[in-house]
């Protein structure tokens, strides 16, 4: 059996990051983690474009337009949707997740779902690097690996 693995090298990659304006204290940490991961793995800051979305619900459309532009090898979507007392959370979190997945599947451009969906602000802060790991960095690493793996798939 042939085992095909990708490397975590971003030297020649061009990424877009989309982040939400809501919960910016949390999201800013995710963006910092994403940028740091990209640069630490050989990417150049000038090959990383950052787009600010009004909210998580708008992210899929922005991701779709960026993917269709042909300018990016991958897109990293970052945000924080924190559960409240209404059903609004379910619609926003579900809509963002489905839209981001559909963008990736329909365009063939890898798009990471780095939107935190948590019950509390504390949980979101922990996932943004306060206690353990930074989901922005993790989403970026997943995209670096995915792009490099896709490049190894033979074209027919």
UniProtKB/Swiss-Prot annotation:
The active site is at residue 88. Disulfide bonds: none annotated. GO terms for molecular function: 6,7-dimethyl-8-ribityllumazine synthase activity. It comes from the Bacteria. It holds the Pfam family DMRL_synthase. The keyword Transferase applies. One of its GO terms (cellular component) is cytosol. Keywords: Riboflavin biosynthesis, Transferase. 5-amino-6-(D-ribitylamino)uracil binds at residues 22, 56-58, 80-82, 113. GO terms for biological process: riboflavin biosynthetic process. (2S)-2-hydroxy-3-oxobutyl phosphate binds at residues 85-86, 127. Its EC number is 2.5.1.78. Pathway: Cofactor biosynthesis; riboflavin biosynthesis; riboflavin from 2-hydroxy-3-oxobutyl phosphate and 5-amino-6-(D-ribitylamino)uracil: step 1/2. PANTHER family: 6,7-DIMETHYL-8-RIBITYLLUMAZINE SYNTHASE, 6,7-DIMETHYL-8-RIBITYLLUMAZINE SYNTHASE DMRL SYNTHASE LUMAZINE SYNTHASE. HAMAP family: Lumazine_synth. Catalyzes the formation of 6,7-dimethyl-8-ribityllumazine by condensation of 5-amino-6-(D-ribitylamino)uracil with 3,4-dihydroxy-2-butanone 4-phosphate. This is the penultimate step in the biosynthesis of riboflavin. Belongs to the DMRL synthase family. This is 6,7-dimethyl-8-ribityllumazine synthase. It comes from Deinococcus deserti (strain DSM 17065 / CIP 109153 / LMG 22923 / VCD115).
